[in-house]
Amino acid sequence: MKSNSNIRPSIIEPLGNGAYHYNYNIVERQETNYETGEVITVFDYDTVKVWDEPTYDKLVKAVIRATFDEMQELSIINEYNAGVLGVTTDKADKEDAKKAYKDYLTFVAETKAKVQADLEAAG
């Protein structure tokens, strides 16, 4: 979920009742308040909700699921494997599947690194 605030969000935000928000991809920017003309600092970021302790594994899974549902993930993997195993013979389809799978794996690796860095920063 995309979020915006004029206060820097904490990386891990307890919501009560065992729920937490993980705020990531936090970007600080300046904008002009349309009512006062004053330049203010705002923060744009992504948010996912997890339950119980916000562990590395839970946060990685939540970020991946916020981008890819299970069916999309399986489709990417199956299309790639169909090309590798020769089930799909169209060269363009194979290349598209290979690129989609590589992009997915890159996203997962970047997500894992980001979550690890955020957890270290959050203490």
Positions of PLM-derived features:
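A preference for well-ordered globular domain cores
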Residues: 2-123
